[in-house]
Amino acid sequence: MPAAFFVVRAIVTDPGKRAAFDRWYEREHVPDAVKAFGVSKAWRFWSLDDPSLHQAMYQFDDEAKLAAMLKGDALNQLVADFNRDWPDVRRSRETLVLAQEFAK
């Protein structure tokens, strides 16, 4: 089974809040999410084209593990934490399945 991914895109419109958001994500949110989701890898990105755009990606072993996480309580708790700490940050979520991987 191919790997599956959970992607969260956040728009941090206030430039003055981006450093605090970045620290919170690095020190609290990603470690909590990795532990709660039981994922094998996680990444975070800031867009080079749009400085307000932050993206986090979590890799699951397969679609079944991603689907189980989406139905579980861990996601609800992490969403509640995000809403509490960053109520003005809009975000969207997407689920993906690996179609191809190329490595040289």
Where is each model-derived feature located?
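Macromolecular interaction modules
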Residues: 1-104
